[in-house]
From Swiss-Prot:
Annotated TM spans: none
Lineage of origin: Bacteria, Pseudomonadati, Bdellovibrionota, Bdellovibrionia, Bdellovibrionales
Family, per entry: Belongs to the UPF0337 (CsbD) family.
Biological source species: Bdellovibrio bacteriovorus (strain ATCC 15356 / DSM 50701 / NCIMB 9529 / HD100)
Top-rank taxon: Bacteria
Protein name, UniProt field: UPF0337 protein Bd3330
Amino acid sequence: MNKDIFQGKIKEISGELRKKWGALTDDDIQKTKGNMEALSGLVQQKIGLSKEEASKQLSEFMTDIDKKFTSTGESASDKVNSKIDAIKNKLSH
């Protein structure tokens, strides 16, 4: 997930972050404004991990989230396209 997409989806991702690291609050997460370095520092501080371990875990988390959002996005996109096709079909008859 690239940086801009991550920053745009921070609200959606916030719940997943709290599931993984319960010590994080929505407020903490929102203050990072989707900045990966700030988020890594937050995980490091709140969870008590080394800088390297926090970065590693956050990177793994983002890979998992990216897969989740990608697969969800594709199925939602497929549904939307299907509805659009159905509407076009109705209008053409």
